[in-house]
């Protein structure tokens, strides 16, 4: 919230409401009207007196209408309606004088200047990276700290410290806040684009999704830089100035300004950390969706047709086209520790901090030794029966990971003749909690 807005809200709210009601203030600016207002602002800035005639407004309306082709032709009637609408909403002031022979001249009102100035200035300022904006703030704060450490009269503090903090540092903080809100909109836009791509054709969309996710990573790095710079250097500078004014009653106005800046800084850093968490969570969600949820061949229909086509190749030849896409980046943690809820009983000290990967390697070795017996004896491996017997002696929370490792070790030993005959196996239960597996008996090694 800007300093002016903070001063305004301290006034009685009913007084402001009565004022708005008395003068019948209202705003209705569709996209085309807003574009017309911005075009008028640009033309006004090019004029020394910032005054425009009706002809110039009609020309501006024609330019806008040409870019909004679906809205209709740029007739004089529609242009006059648009001008009158802006005048009615107190965005344009109309003047008529004898010097202009009855023709009207127009100027932007303070309200219109505030609206257009926001869009024009914000468009230019939002192009700056947050790291650059924070560097600008740090430079201004350094000037204020230097002046504060020099000390001096109250006039010195008002000119060289208070002025810099209130009208320079505070302004940049407000712009950073606006830029952060734009980044929130960009985050939502990226989510919508990814959802739209995946809903249309996920095969062709994976590369596009990866490009969008790379933008996410760039944003993450920028947010982390923002937190580091804002949380360290700026905080130190604020504390340095507070130390200089501590206990001096004549400099209470400096302390009030520092308190307002501290609130803005806290808001920036808090927003940054929250956004980082949201970006990471969404990035992992999309990668998980691409890895697991996009399974368009759950019934193995495609694999069966492919095997059948290979068997019939000499009778019905065909061409194979394949795409070698780059692998998606996996942003999961490199190592995961054992979950507390999975640890039961007394845990020995030597394995208390053992990582999950080490446990997986040990279990995989044991499972491999168990399955080698089937290979040595030439016996078939019915994965459904093997899994059911093996999982029965382990806690339920371990079933998913253990089943994955059993299947992984089994397919390394051999394969099923039924797979090459395109025979689809039935789903078979492997525990008493609803878990099922669909796999042919491994009978070739």
UniProtKB/Swiss-Prot annotation:
Region feature Leucine-zipper, mapped onto this chain: 213-241
Subunit-level organization: Interacts, and probably forms a ternary complex, with MukE and MukB via its C-terminal region. The complex formation is stimulated by calcium or magnesium. It is required for an interaction between MukE and MukB.
Compartment annotation: Cytoplasm, Nucleoid
Protein family membership: Belongs to the MukF family.
Record has rRNA-binding as a keyword: no
Primary gene name: mukF
SUPFAM superfamilies named in the record: MukF C-terminal domain-like, Winged helix' DNA-binding domain
Source organism: Vibrio cholerae serotype O1 (strain ATCC 39541 / Classical Ogawa 395 / O395)
Stated role: Involved in chromosome condensation, segregation and cell cycle progression. May participate in facilitating chromosome segregation by condensation DNA from both sides of a centrally located replisome during cell division. Not required for mini-F plasmid partitioning. Probably acts via its interaction with MukB and MukE. Overexpression results in anucleate cells. It has a calcium binding activity.
A Pfam family this chain is assigned to: KicB
InterPro entries: Chromosome_partition_MukF (IPR005582), MukF_C (IPR033441), MukF_C_sf (IPR038198), MukF_M (IPR033440), MukF_M_sp (IPR036141), MukF_WHTH (IPR033439), WH-like_DNA-bd_sf (IPR036388), WH_DNA-bd_sf (IPR036390)
Protein name: Chromosome partition protein MukF
Keyword set includes Signal: no
Alphabetical GO biological process terms: cell division; chromosome condensation; chromosome segregation; DNA replication
Cellular component terms (Gene Ontology): cytoplasm; nucleoid
Keywords of this entry: Calcium, Cell cycle, Cell division, Chromosome partition, Cytoplasm, DNA condensation
């Amino acid at each position: 919230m800007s300093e002016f807005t903070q001063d305004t809200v301290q006034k009685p709210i009913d007084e402001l409401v009565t004022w708005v009601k008395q003068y019948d203030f209202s705003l209705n600016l569709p996209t085309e009207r807003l574009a017309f207002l911005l075009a008028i602002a640009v033309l006004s800035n090019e004029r020394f007196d910032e005054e425009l005639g009706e002809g110039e407004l009609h020309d501006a309306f024609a330019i806008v209408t040409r870019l909004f082709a679906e809205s209709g032709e740029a007739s004089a009637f529609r242009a006059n309606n648009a001008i009158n609408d802006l005048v009615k909403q107190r965005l344009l002031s109309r003047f008529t004088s004898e010097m202009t022979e009855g023709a009207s001249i127009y100027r932007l009102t303070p309200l219109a200047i505030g609206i257009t100035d926001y869009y024009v200035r914000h468009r230019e300022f939002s192009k700056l990276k947050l790291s650059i904006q924070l560097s600008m703030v740090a430079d201004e704060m350094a000037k204020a700290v230097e002046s504060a450490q020099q000390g001096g009269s109250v006039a010195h503090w008002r000119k060289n410290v208070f002025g810099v903090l209130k009208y320079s540092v505070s302004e940049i903080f407000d712009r950073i806040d606006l830029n952060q809100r734009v980044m929130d909109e960009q985050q939502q836009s990226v989510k919508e684009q990814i959802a739209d791509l995946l809903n249309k054709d996920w095969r062709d969309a994976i590369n596009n999704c990866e490009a969008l996710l790379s933008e996410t990573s760039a944003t993450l790095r920028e947010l982390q830089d923002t937190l580091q710079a804002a949380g360290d250097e700026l905080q130190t500078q604020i504390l340095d100035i507070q130390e200089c004014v501590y206990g001096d009653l004549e400099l209470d106005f400096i302390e009030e300004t520092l308190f307002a800046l501290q609130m803005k800084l806290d808001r920036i850093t808090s927003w940054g950390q929250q956004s980082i968490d949201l970006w990471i969570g969404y990035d992992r969600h999309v990668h998980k969706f691409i890895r697991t949820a996009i399974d368009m061949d759950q019934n193995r229909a495609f694999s069966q047709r492919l095997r059948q086509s290979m068997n019939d190749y000499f009778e019905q030849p065909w061409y194979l086209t394949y795409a070698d896409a780059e692998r998606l980046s996996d942003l999961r943690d490199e190592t995961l520790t054992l979950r507390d809820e999975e640890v039961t009983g007394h845990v020995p000290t030597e394995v208390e901090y053992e990582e999950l990967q080490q446990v997986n390697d040990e279990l995989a070795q044991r499972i491999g030794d168990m399955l080698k017996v089937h290979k040595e004896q030439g016996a078939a491996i019915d994965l459904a029966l093997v899994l059911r017997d093996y999982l029965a002696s382990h806690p339920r929370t371990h079933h998913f990971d253990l089943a994955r490792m059993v299947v992984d070790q089994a397919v390394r030993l051999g394969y099923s003749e039924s797979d090459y005959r395109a025979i689809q196996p039935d789903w078979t239960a492997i525990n008493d909690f609803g878990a099922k597996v669909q796999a042919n008996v491994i009978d070739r090694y």
